[in-house]
């Protein structure tokens, strides 16, 4: 909103692990050196796909990056269950999935690739957003990565019981937010949005 600072949380991985090997794609000459460069690369390789779809990045076997992905129809020979620092910190409470995984029920890779395209668009817009922690908060829009399952668990609530109004209400008030008039939700996404808003 004009004249207001807005903090928005989005539920996807903002980048791949880098701290463990010193690179997103070790040994690849074209490996991006920064998160914004990674977003630009994903956008370049997926530019023809609509609605920020990131599938082309995971399916192009001619690119060296493919060797690091567990992708539909092909498990790269360099794929490992690497974790970012933020995921290592979360392990004592919950178990985030590896961002390089693009298949199966625990897949977060495809959604994160779409998210990276979104981050590229937001940060390159005429009125750019700041994507923290890769850029400091600024006037206007700042976007941060969220992990709703963690927010439930940090206050002793069960994320699997998201449809239970009492469980959701307890989770929200656990973050010192006012009790909701109604904690009934129509979907898990709605429950995630409400607990994330309270946590932020």
Describe the residue ranges of each PLM region:
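RNase H-like (RuvC/DEDD) metal-dependent nuclease/polynucleotide-processing core
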Residues: 1-200
